[in-house]
């Protein structure tokens, strides 16, 4: 039961972050959103790490810290692409596409020559077909032609980069999850600050500061909850439940934002989320 509660908390936290960040991404700087979410999250993670974390010791652990930091740098690109997707598209459409980062992780694992479960060979085609159906919407003039739905390209790009982040974090497994999060978060902030200063994009409108601060705290909480869930296990249960982030985001978009994807897109959403759930069973 503890694993289920922690995993559900993680999924709900990420879905709520997507919902809360949509108006920020549309009205303010995407870079400022990434910067301040990560600053708040890193401060929260650092506070927890000061109590239960340990600094790396020895060559293997410092090598792992390097991979964690590199993952943090890639996270900057992933978050920028993701917030751009949220600024342009419907939550119920882009969120399932963002969830297919696990499919990209599998592809990268295959590229480097590692073996995968047979279930993956079912999930990957589902993810491709589901992603394609979700990404296109009917033309406004009522004709049979279709065009790419707003934000879907950015969502797929974010998923691909998050897939790389997962691989890099996997290489940092010699460290405790909270330590990985700390080094990744510090690298994210260090990479984002110069970008924000160079583009003069660090200012966040006052009306969004509470929202972004809450998202930063939820981001840290989700990370800690996920780390605890994976430590308790079993991992397939954690993977399946956390994979429902996309499902929760779809429901939030349809219920709270009044979004209405087309029938074809709904079919794509179902296929995509099914693929993500299947991939969760082999996590």
Question: Which stretches of residues belong to each language-model region?
Answer:
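Alpha-helical transmembrane segments of compact multi-pass small-molecule transporters, enriched
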Residues: 39-45, 97-110, 187-191, 222-226, ...
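Structural signature of hydrophobic alpha-helical transmembrane segments
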Residues: 1-13, 58-75, 114-129, 175-189, ...
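Membrane-interface interhelical linkers
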Residues: 1-13, 20-68, 79-89, 138-153, ...
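Hydrophobic alpha-helical transmembrane segments in multi-pass integral membrane proteins
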Residues: 44-56, 105-120, 160-178, 219-236, ...
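Transmembrane alpha-helical core positions of polytopic small-molecule transporters
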Residues: 14-15, 41, 67, 71-79, ...
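Hydrophobic/aromatic residues within transmembrane alpha-helices
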Residues: 24, 33, 85, 111-116, ...
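C-terminal transmembrane-helix exit sites in multi-pass transporters
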Residues: 82-84, 103-122, 195-200, 247-266
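Hydrophobic transmembrane alpha-helices of multi-pass small-molecule transport proteins
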Residues: 100, 104-109, 119-138, 264-283
């Amino acid at each position: 039961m503890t694993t289920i509660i922690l995993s559900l908390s993680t999924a709900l936290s990420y879905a709520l972050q997507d919902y809360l960040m949509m108006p920020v991404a549309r009205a303010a700087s995407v870079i400022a959103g990434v910067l301040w979410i990560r600053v708040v999250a890193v401060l929260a993670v650092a506070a927890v790490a000061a109590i239960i974390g340990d600094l790396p010791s020895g060559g293997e652990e410092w090598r792992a810290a390097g991979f964690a930091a590199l993952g943090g740098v890639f996270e900057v690109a992933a978050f920028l692409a993701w917030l751009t997707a949220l600024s342009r598209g419907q939550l119920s459409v882009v969120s399932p596409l963002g969830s297919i980062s696990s499919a990209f992780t599998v592809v990268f694992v295959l590229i480097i020559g590692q073996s995968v479960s047979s279930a993956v060979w079912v999930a990957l085609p589902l993810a491709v077909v589901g992603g394609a159906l979700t990404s296109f919407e009917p033309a406004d003039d009522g004709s049979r032609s279709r065009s790419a739905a707003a934000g879907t390209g950015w969502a797929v790009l974010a998923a691909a980069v998050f897939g790389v982040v997962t691989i890099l974090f996997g290489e940092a497994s010699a460290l405790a999850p909270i330590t990985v999060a700390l080094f990744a978060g510090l690298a994210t902030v260090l990479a984002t600050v110069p970008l924000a200063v160079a583009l003069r994009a660090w200012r966040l409108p006052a009306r969004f500061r509470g929202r972004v601060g809450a998202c930063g705290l939820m981001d840290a909480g989700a990370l800690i909850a996920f780390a605890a869930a994976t430590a308790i296990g079993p991992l397939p249960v954690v993977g399946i439940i956390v994979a429902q982030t996309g499902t929760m985001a779809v429901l939030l978009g349809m219920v709270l934002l009044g979004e209405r994807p087309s029938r074809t897109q709904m079919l794509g959403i179902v296929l995509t989320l099914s693929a993500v759930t299947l991939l969760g069973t082999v996590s």
